[in-house]
Amino acid sequence: MKAALIFLLLLIFSLTLYPQRDVEALVDYMVGSFSSEEQAEKDSGYFNIELEMVKIWKDRRDGPWIYIEQAVVESKDNPYRQRVYQIKQRSDGKIESIVYSIPEPLRFAGDYKKEFPLLRLTPDSLLIREGCEVVLYRADDGYFEGRTIDKNCSSDLRGASYATSEVMIDKDKMITWDRGFDENGNQVWGATEGGYIFKKKLNRFQKR
């Protein structure tokens, strides 16, 4: 009886570790340098974009936190998107990537190269993008897949009313499809034929 109880307790403990392992795997997949160069060479409908993702604020217990920069390769020093993601485990077993914008973001352009990115910034100075969180789950094959919820992510870019994001994240690539729609559901920005395919490159900056 005692042995059975110990086995049951060990089983419960091991099951509680699985979600955290998924979070760690997701962050490991996300962190790095990515490029859509291969896709852009094959299809002129896509730009050659570079994506940098690094862990930040590693001593905080409410993360992991990730800083991202996204730029057309010809304008690497002038990124068109800078965000902070907070990765959290949900009670239903899924993972949530909460999205924050940065006030005056260009002052931090290139911070991904530093040993301690966004050192002069704190979470309470970020602006949460309500409704823009991406909810992810881990597929049986090991990759992660997720999307924003319904029309909850507001956007006024190029006449949009809301935006959607769909992602697939694997250990060597990431597919992201960001689109904006007007109030009638017509797409007004973003790729039309499918998501951007970012291949992971060797990241010489990030220390695991």
What kind of region is each of these model predictions?
Residues 1-21:
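Bacterial Sec-dependent N-terminal signal peptides
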Residues 23-25, 36-61:
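Short, solvent-exposed loop/hinge segments that bridge or flank secondary-structure elements
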Residues 14, 44, 183-184:
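Generic secondary-structure boundary signal with a strong preference for alpha-helix termini
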Residues 25, 31, 37, 48, ...:
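Calycin-type beta-barrel ligand-binding domains and close structural analogs
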Residues 51-79:
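N-terminal glycine/threonine-rich, aromatic-flanked beta-hairpin/loop signature
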